[in-house]
């Protein structure tokens, strides 16, 4: 296993495979099927460790864990002009900024 494993994992049920599937957000092409959630998590963690070790040995860039990334709180979203207008009107009618309205809608 990785010494300082800080990657983001998820275990979910696969109806198609009739098993649990372990996934890693930072390595979207990897997965591990197992009969129990615990085994799926252990399996995907081992696969990630093996792949990261191989990448390091080949001097490839290993993905940075999401948990270590800095988030500024800002991102740009492109929307159609008519939606921009509707949201601006809704914000004005509510007496809030467009940013505050968009943030409230995104957090729902």
What are these regions (language model features)?
Residues 1-8, 45-108:
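Short, charged, surface-exposed hinge/linker loops at domain edges
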Residues 27-28, 83:
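Short, charged/polar surface micro-motifs in flexible loops or helix N-caps
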Residues 28-39:
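A short, exposed loop/beta-hairpin motif centered on an aromatic-Gly-Thr core
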Residues 18-21, 40-41, 63:
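Intrinsically disordered, low-complexity segments enriched in polar/charged residues with Gly/Pro
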Residues 11-27:
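Short aromatic-glycine-(Arg/Gly/Cys) micro-motifs in beta-strand/loop hairpins
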Residues 19-21, 32-34, 87:
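Short acidic, gly/pro-rich beta-turn/loop elements at beta-sheet edges
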């Amino acid at each position: 296993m990785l010494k300082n494993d800080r990657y983001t994992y998820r275990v979910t049920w696969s109806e198609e495979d009739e098993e649990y599937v372990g996934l890693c957000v930072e390595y979207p092409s990897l997965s591990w099927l197992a009969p129990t959630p615990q085994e799926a998590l252990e399996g995907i963690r081992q696969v990630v460790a093996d792949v990261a070790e191989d990448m390091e040995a080949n001097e490839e860039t290993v993905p940075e864990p999401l948990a270590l990334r800095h988030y500024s709180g800002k991102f740009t979203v492109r929307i159609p002009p008519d939606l921009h207008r509707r949201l601006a009107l809704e914000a004005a009618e509510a007496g809030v900024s467009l940013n505050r309205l968009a943030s409230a809608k995104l957090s729902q």
